[in-house]
Amino acid sequence: MAIFDTDIFIWIQRGNSKAARLIENTAERYLSIQTFMELLQGAASKDQHKYTKSFIKDFNFIVLPLTENIGHRALIYVEEYSLSHGIRAGDAIIAATAVENNLPLSTSNKKHFKAVRDLNLKVFKP
């Protein structure tokens, strides 16, 4: 069981078999609505939109919505860590989604999240 950061999907799109196995070997798969939006925003065509949506559906990802609690926690993370560690709003939302849902976050971007002490970080090494 894990929530996946956007970078894991990017590794898969680049053909990284370790990232693909990570997804395949995780029984319960989650992603933040923020990650879903980032994936769609990064698409270069409607076909890539379709592919992304199909991938999410075919692998039974549960897309976790932005709730009031997640928004509040993300705001705290931005206030606490944006100046000292450079955390950006999108990463704060993803981290807050993981913490609020008591899920480990799988990412290869350790530096984006290392400041968030209450986050269970699972670092992926491509």
Task: Identify the meaning behind each predicted range.
Residues 1-31, 41-54:
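Short, well-structured N-terminal submotif of metal-dependent ribonuclease cores
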Residues 8, 35, 70, 93-94, ...:
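Alpha-helix capping/helix-boundary segments
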Residues 5-6, 39, 74, 98, ...:
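Generic structural signal for small/hydrophobic residues in well-ordered secondary structure
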Residues 62-108:
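Active-site neighborhoods of divalent-metal-dependent phosphate/nucleic-acid chemistry enzymes
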Residues 9-10, 37-40, 114, 122:
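Nucleotide phosphate-binding site architecture
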Residues 4-7, 32, 86-88, 109-110, ...:
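Histidine- and aromatic-rich ligand-binding microenvironments
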Residues 2, 28-30, 59-63, 104:
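Short loop->beta-strand "edge-of-pocket" segments that line small-molecule binding or catalytic clefts
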Residues 1, 95, 101-126:
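Acidic, PIN/NYN-like endoribonuclease modules and their adjacent C-terminal/linker elements
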